């Protein structure tokens, strides 16, 4: 961000020196692309990370690069286009370009993808918060000490109502907006999922809770659903089945907007940036009309309540 002389990192700075993170977590945080694939025959899923699991090929493009991640073990190749525009960075995946060697019952198929999930991660020394569109909005403050609490998860526009829940969900409000914000000291960023948002899940965790010293927030995309069930009353062995057919969304895209503010930024600047995105780029128009009502009407109600004395 040249306007504020701020360096935003796609993966946490000095993550390899984090003494609280295991090698697996370090690889997780260091990966610009994470993937989960399913094996129908084995009824199981496997996590893959670009750091350690993929070979990378880079090709220059207009205003950006196209990086192809080849996961040889899974036989899956995922191209991601990173584009730098005047006021944002965009990461985009066209699912039609994803190559899967074998999606049959005996093969491997992509079930979820996460790109730049550690972008803008805050360290244990940083001061700030994530702006989460949970209901009317909520703040998750960095390093708040809630290490044993469950990490935040919110499905954009709600979870799949046809899926049978395996556990009691956390008490949260509905995520109505495909965005979140990062406010870190004198700098801020608004992040919006512009495509594939109906299949997006927003996750956030603070230091300790993330099994590292970093505070992290980002989107995960479900491209094929899966379900788990148990046979013959045996609760010790879970069987997983996967959605058939092609991936359910054509494009996945996330934009990162660094904010320019005259004063120290806060969550109102994040909200303003998202409003500007809606009106200037997403085609949302103001339908409210200024009118002078001829009548103001207030309703009052009451009830009789019996009480022991």
Regions found by a protein language model. Give the residues of each.
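Carbohydrate-recognition beta-sandwich/jelly-roll modules
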Residues: 1-309
């Amino acid at each position: 961000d040249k306007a504020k002389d701020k360096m935003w990192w796609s993966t946490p700075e000095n993550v390899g020196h984090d003494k609280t993170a295991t090698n697996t977590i370090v690889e997780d945080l260091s990966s610009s692309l994470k993937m989960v694939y399913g094996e129908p025959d084995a009824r199981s899923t496997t996590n893959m990370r670009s750091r350690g699991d993929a070979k990378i090929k880079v090709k220059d493009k207009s205003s950006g690069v196209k990086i192809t991640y080849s996961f040889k073990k899974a036989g899956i190749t995922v191209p991601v286009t990173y584009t730098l525009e005047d006021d944002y960075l965009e990461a985009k995946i066209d699912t039609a370009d994803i190559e899967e060697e074998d999606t049959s019952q005996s093969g491997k198929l992509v079930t979820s993808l996460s790109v730049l999930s550690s972008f803008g991660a805050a360290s244990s020394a940083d001061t700030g918060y994530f702006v989460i569109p949970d209901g009317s909005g909520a703040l998750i403050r960095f390093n708040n000490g809630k290490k044993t609490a469950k990490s935040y998860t919110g499905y954009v526009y709600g979870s799949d109502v046809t899926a049978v829940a395996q556990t009691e969900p956390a008490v949260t409000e509905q995520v109505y907006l495909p965005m979140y914000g990062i406010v870190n000291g004198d700098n801020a960023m608004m992040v919006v999922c512009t495509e594939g948002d109906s299949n997006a899940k927003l996750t956030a965790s603070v230091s300790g809770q993330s099994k590292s010293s970093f505070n992290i927030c980002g989107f995960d995309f479900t491209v094929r659903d899966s379900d788990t069930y148990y046979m013959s009353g045996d609760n010790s062995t879970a069987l997983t089945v996967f959605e058939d057919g092609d991936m359910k969304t054509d494009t996945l895209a996330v934009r990162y907007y660094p904010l320019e503010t005259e004063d120290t930024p806060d969550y109102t600047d994040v909200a303003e940036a998202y409003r500007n995105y809606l009106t200037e780029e997403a085609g949302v128009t103001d339908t409210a009309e200024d009118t002078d009502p001829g009548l103001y009407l207030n309703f009052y109600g009451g009830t009789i309540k019996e009480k022991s004395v």
